[in-house]
Structures are given as structure tokens and as C-alpha cells.
């Protein structure tokens, strides 16, 4: 078909033209969220398999993390489509710039979730059953900031959900150790996402968005410190349960140093420093994973 003498663009051409918008909507150009979701999932795969996860499960979970994090960003922007324009850090996002429609975003969300579910079908019945929890958490988190001061707890539950799924995929069971690691990840997520919320606090107060940063108020730094100490304590318990040795313990020392550095960054509560402290948590996840890899690699 032609329009005014010109051929209509093909579906592929239309998609190519929209690709920069979709990349912005899924945050593929900002991988920090993917890293923070991926690290605990890799911890679980390594612990469940004692350092030797199947290549099939490794592919499924790495690709699944990328897809579900992208889906989470899409539904988050859909939920925040009327408020992102009022927040300095988010006013450049596709919805805030009127670059994407609601139908487009929901369609993209459905595609990403659908492909993720297809991946899960190659695991086992227990993992498939648990995947329903992942979808429920990813879909509800964006709306929590309007109803509770604890949306970070829901985010933590969502970001840690790959842990029971990874154990289920490797062992066809979710042992008690998995839930201890899950707890550590939830607490850690609340800590770093509180720092993220501290960066947006002034804008959030103006538009009525709730967060732990607002809940904690002037006690925010102390609350984050307490959560970080608790994270270390639970991770130490995880190591004790799995009889992990020096490499893992050294990784926890590195994590402690990184937490101290983050406290140094947020001491003035500036948006720039709080966001930098949030980003630094990528190295926390990487340090723990490296400790686990070395632990199982050199285990007698």
C-alpha cells in the first residue's frame, strides 16, 4: 500500500524507528537495575548447585532477569506516567516526554512477560508455580508508593524472588537456606532503595509519593546503616549454613567496606551522593558472587 505516493513503512521499519523509545522505557541503556536483580539470582544458583549450575538454568535465569527487569521498568513507568514529569530525575523518561502510549507500554509489558514465561516452561513444575509470585510482585510494586511508606519492602520481595526460583530449578525444592538468602536480599534491597529514594525525597514530598526515605525522615542514615548491618549478619549466617570459608568471608569484609563508603557518600543527603551510593551496590552484589565462585572453585 502507498500513502500519497510513498510506501507505508513495514512493521520492521516502524519497530526500528521506535527502538530508541523502547530502550528508554525498558532501561536497557541503564543496566544497574539488571545487575541488582541478577546478583542475588546468581548467588542462589551457585549455592543451590554448589558452584556448578546447569548451563540451561544459567541461560534461563540470566536472560529471564534481563526480560523481567525490563518488564518491571515498563510497568513502573506506566504506573508513574502522570508523576514522572514532576520529578527532576525522571522527567526525561518516555511517558514524561509523551513519546509512548499506554497501549504501547502495556503491549510491550505483555510481550516481555510472555517470553519470560516461555523460558520458565523449560524448568520444572515448582519453578513454574513460583513464577506466578514473580509476576505478581513485579506488577504490584509500582503502585505501592501511593498507598504505603514501605514500597521498598515490596521491591525487595520482588528482587529476591529469583532466589527461591533458582533453588527450585536446581533442586526441585526450596530449602530453608534459600529463604535465609532471600531475607538477606530483601533487607539489602530496602537499604539501597532507601538511598535511591533519598535522592528523590524533595520531589516525592511535593507530589505525595511515599517511600522509606520519607518514613525514616532524619533517621534515614541510621536506618540504612542498621539495614546494612543486618544484611551482613544474615549473609554471615548463610555462609555458616553452607559451611563457606575464607573466600566468602573476605567478600563480606569487602561488602562491609563498601557499606561504610556508602554511608560516607550519603552523609550530606544530597541527591547526587545518594544516587551514587545506590549505584555502588552493584559492587556489593559482585563481591558476594566472586566470593561464592572462588569458594566453590577451590573447595577440596
From Swiss-Prot:
It holds the Pfam family UbiA. Its EC number is 2.5.1.39. Belongs to the UbiA prenyltransferase family. This is 4-hydroxybenzoate octaprenyltransferase. It catalyses: all-trans-octaprenyl diphosphate + 4-hydroxybenzoate = 4-hydroxy-3-(all-trans-octaprenyl)benzoate + diphosphate. It is found in: Cell inner membrane. It comes from Hahella chejuensis (strain KCTC 2396). Its main location: membrane. GO terms for molecular function: 4-hydroxybenzoate polyprenyltransferase activity. The gene is ubiA. Catalyzes the prenylation of para-hydroxybenzoate (PHB) with an all-trans polyprenyl group. Mediates the second step in the final reaction sequence of ubiquinone-8 (UQ-8) biosynthesis, which is the condensation of the polyisoprenoid side chain with PHB, generating the first membrane-bound Q intermediate 3-octaprenyl-4-hydroxybenzoate. Pathway: Cofactor biosynthesis; ubiquinone biosynthesis. InterPro entries: HB_polyprenyltransferase-like (IPR006370), Prenyltransferase (IPR039653), UbiA_prenyltransferase (IPR000537), UbiA_prenylTrfase_CS (IPR030470), UbiA_sf (IPR044878). The chain crosses the membrane at residues 32-52, 55-75, 108-128, 149-169, 178-198, 222-242, 246-266, 278-298. GO terms for biological process: ubiquinone biosynthetic process. It is a multi-pass membrane protein. It is an enzyme of class 2 (transferase). Its cofactor is Mg(2+). One of its GO terms (cellular component) is plasma membrane.
Amino acid at each position: 500500500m502507498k500513502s500519497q505516493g510513498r510506501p507505508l513503512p513495514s512493521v520492521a521499519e516502524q519497530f526500528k524507528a521506535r527502538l530508541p523509545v523502547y530502550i528508554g522505557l525498558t532501561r536497557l541503556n541503564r543496566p544497574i537495575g539488571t545487575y541488582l536483580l541478577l546478583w542475588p539470582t546468581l548467588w542462589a544458583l551457585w549455592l543451590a548447585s554448589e558452584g556448578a549450575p546447569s548451563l540451561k538454568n544459567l541461560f534461563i535465569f540470566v536472560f529471564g532477569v534481563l526480560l523481567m527487569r525490563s518488564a518491571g521498568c515498563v510497568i513502573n513507568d506506566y504506573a508513574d506516567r502522570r508523576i514522572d514529569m514532576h520529578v527532576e530525575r525522571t522527567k526525561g523518561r518516555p511517558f514524561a516526554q509523551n513519546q509512548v502510549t499506554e497501549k504501547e507500554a502495556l503491549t510491550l509489558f505483555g510481550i516481555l512477560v510472555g517470553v519470560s514465561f516461555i523460558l520458565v516452561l523449560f524448568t520444572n513444575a515448582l519453578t513454574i508455580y513460583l513464577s506466578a509470585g514473580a509476576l505478581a510482585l513485579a506488577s504490584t510494586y509500582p503502585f505501592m508508593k501511593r498507598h504505603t511508606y514501605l514500597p521498598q519492602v515490596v521491591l525487595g520481595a520482588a528482587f529476591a524472588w529469583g532466589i527461591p526460583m533458582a533453588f527450585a530449578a536446581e533442586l526441585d525444592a526450596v530449602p530453608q537456606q534459600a529463604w535465609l538468602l532471600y531475607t538477606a536480599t530483601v533487607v539489602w534491597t530496602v537499604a539501597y532503595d532507601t538511598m535511591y529514594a533519598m535522592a528523590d525525597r524533595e520531589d516525592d514530598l511535593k507530589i505525595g509519593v511515599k517511600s522509606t526515605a520519607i518514613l525514616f525522615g532524619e533517621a534515614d542514615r541510621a536506618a540504612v546503616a542498621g539495614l546494612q548491618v543486618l544484611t551482613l549478619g544474615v549473609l554471615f549466617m548463610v555462609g555458616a549454613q553452607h559451611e563457606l570459608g575464607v573466600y566468602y568471608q573476605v567478600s563480606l569484609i569487602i561488602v562491609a567496606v563498601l557499606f561504610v563508603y556508602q554511608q560516607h557518600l550519603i552523609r550530606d543527603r544530597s541527591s547526587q551522593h545518594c544516587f551514587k551510593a545506590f549505584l555502588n551496590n552493584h559492587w556489593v552484589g559482585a563481591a558476594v558472587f566472586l566470593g561464592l565462585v572462588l569458594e566453590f572453585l577451590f573447595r577440596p
